[in-house]
UniProtKB/Swiss-Prot annotation:
Organism of this sequence: Banana bunchy top virus (isolate Autralia) (BBTV)
Gene designation: DNA-U3
Protein name per the record: Uncharacterized protein U3
Amino acid sequence: MTEGQGNRSTLFWLAQQDTRINLLIRRTRGRTEILLHLYKYPNPVKDNCSLSSVKVVVLRRKIASGDRRNDLHLERRRGNYEAYIGYL
């Protein structure tokens, strides 16, 4: 298993453990597209057991073959949580 495959497996595992995240990875014309849906919570501490009717963050990134960069983090801006994903 290469480093890139390990990063991708870790991302799959994290997405499977958190019910707030839906992760879809698909290959099109030799490139991999990641769609990460992160359900935002009005208050992620107090309301962590139910999905609320709030915005869904959809991230799409084209991943170049052989690129080993991996960056996934959350930032809080204006009371909302936004997710960012880099290249795997």
